[in-house]
């Protein structure tokens, strides 16, 4: 009976030798070693994957930054072009160099002070007109119409509120002060309730106006000034 286990052991050893089957302990140790190797390889690969992800994220951020910067420059360029359209001589030249961003800024810096001066002059002019209106509210309207091309004759129409009976005589005096000869005159009542009367004068100028001068406007302003002075004296 004791020889039977020995016999089985020898048979098992013979089978292992012939079939190259390793012992069970060896198989367990080998599987454990392979598992450890796979885990270590997986750990070594993970940092590489993180590096790839970081590089891809950095490239995406750079592309996004470049796109935003490109859009910002396009909007800025469009703003410069819009600013250039406000300049008076924008349509007179199609040169791209002239209307580049630096040139537009230079032109704007030069143009704005001119506008400020014009605004100042117009403001003073408005103040003078308001003052004249305050001092002589009875004058409603005045117009001067040139007759023919000679420049010697004109029709002056003055509409004002009749304050006294000698208003017509005062207007004749104003015409004479301006160097005008009255050829004919007429009056017409426009508004009876407000006592507004229109005086029409066909006048002739003693001297021919200088060519190129807006003498009609000058004459109109001079007549208005004379009327204001007469009103102030009263």
From Swiss-Prot:
Q: Which domain of life is it from?
A: Eukaryota
Record carries keyword Isomerase:
no
Where does this protein have compositionally biased stretches of type Polar residues? 1-13
Q: Where in the cell is it found?
A: Nucleus
Q: Which GO terms describe its cellular component?
A: nucleus
Q: Which Pfam families match?
A: HLH
Q: Where is this region: Disordered?
A: 1-67
Q: Which GO terms describe its biological process?
A: cellular response to copper ion; regulation of DNA-templated transcription; regulation of transcription by RNA polymerase II
Protein name (record):
Transcription factor bHLH160
Q: Which organism is it from?
A: Arabidopsis thaliana (Mouse-ear cress)
What gene is this protein translated from? BHLH160
């Amino acid at each position: 009976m004791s020889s039977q286990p020995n016999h089985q052991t020898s048979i098992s050893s013979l089978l292992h030798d012939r079939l190259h089957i390793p012992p069970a302990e060896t198989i367990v140790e080998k599987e454990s070693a392979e598992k450890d190797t796979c885990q270590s390889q997986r750990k070594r690969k993970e940092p590489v994957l993180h590096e790839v992800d970081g590089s891809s994220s950095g490239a995406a951020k750079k592309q996004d930054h470049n796109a935003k910067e490109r859009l910002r420059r396009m909007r800025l360029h469009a703003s410069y072009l819009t600013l250039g359209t406000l300049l008076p001589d924008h349509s007179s030249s199609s040169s791209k160099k002239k209307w580049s961003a630096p040139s537009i800024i230079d032109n704007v810096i030069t143009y704005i002070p001119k506008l400020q001066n014009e605004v100042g002059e117009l403001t003073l002019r408005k103040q003078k007109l308001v003052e004249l209106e305050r001092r002589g509210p009875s004058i409603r309207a005045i117009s001067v119409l040139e007759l023919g091309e000679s420049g010697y004759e004109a029709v002056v129409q003055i509409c004002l509120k009749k304050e006294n009976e000698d208003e017509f005589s005062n207007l004749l005096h104003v015409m004479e002060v301006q160097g005008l000869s009255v050829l004919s005159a007429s009056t017409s009542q426009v508004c009876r309730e407000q006592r507004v009367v229109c005086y029409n004068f066909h006048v002739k100028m003693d001297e021919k106006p200088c060519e190129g001068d807006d003498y009609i406007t000058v004459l109109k302003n001079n007549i208005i000034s004379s009327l204001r002075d007469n009103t102030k004296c009263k």
